[in-house]
Amino acid sequence: TGVMDGYQQATIHLGHDDEGDIVATFVRRDPSKLPMRARWRRQRFALRGHRLAVMYVHGWNDYFYRRHESEFWESLGIPFYAVDLRKFGRSLRDGQTPGYIEDLHDYAAEFNALRDLVVAEQGEQVRILLVAHSQGGLSSVLWLNSQRPHHVEAVALDSPWLELQGNRMFRILSTPVVQAFQLGGGKTVMPMRDPGFYGRCIDCETGGDWDYLRHPLVDPQRFFPRAGWMRAIYN
């Protein structure tokens, strides 16, 4: 998935695992292509000493493409930064298992790096609003709780996946099932069917609202729920 028109992206390296290099991708509007009003509002905030910024984290089987969110915040004079987490969207490399992770706390590397970039570009006085969707909401609050990151002063969660759907009994009964599947290896595919409602409701070709850059995957790379990933969610 390439960079969107009018945007810039940067890739950071996070190390490697058994599937190769691990990277994350940061995306933002190109400051030189912002509308004049947005640039003026940025300057006004800076002169008043009110430096604000937004960090955006996507959800499962997702990446950043929602231009309207960036354009809304930028129209107010507030810089907007998004991240494609490791093995999602622009950060997925050949041979990698899409979205796979065994410990959600590992995403702290991406979050810390993006926070540091925001502070470096916007100054030490910047106050950051963290906006996160679905699984990104869960990963984000784990980061906030464990690290108490500086400069992040507020959080807004969109449909956060903070707990499993269903009641407590569902978790009690399903936990041994997840553990049993993990005996076959963390990347064992879980027998969970995705009806595809989410994909259809966002894609303009199937009645949704957005015309976005698709990230085609061959069958071995499809976004199947894996036992190791599910265990990370349960933990």
Question: What would you call each of these model-derived segments?
Answer:
Residues M36-R37, Q221-N235:
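Active-site nucleophile elbow and catalytic-triad environment of alpha/beta-hydrolase enzymes
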Residues T1-L47:
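N-terminal cap/lid segment of alpha/beta-hydrolase-fold proteins
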Residues E71, S75, A120, N145-S146:
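Short, well-ordered alpha-helices that flank and scaffold nucleotide-derived cofactor binding pockets
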Residues R29-R86, L92-D94:
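Short, surface-exposed "cap/lid" segments of acyl-processing enzymes
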Residues H133-Q135, S139-A227:
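Alpha/beta-hydrolase-fold enzymes
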Residues W60-N61, R66, G89-V126:
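Catalytic nucleophile-loop/oxyanion-hole region of alpha/beta-hydrolase
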Residues P79, V126-R127, H151-A154:
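Residues at the starts of beta-strands that form the adenosine-phosphate
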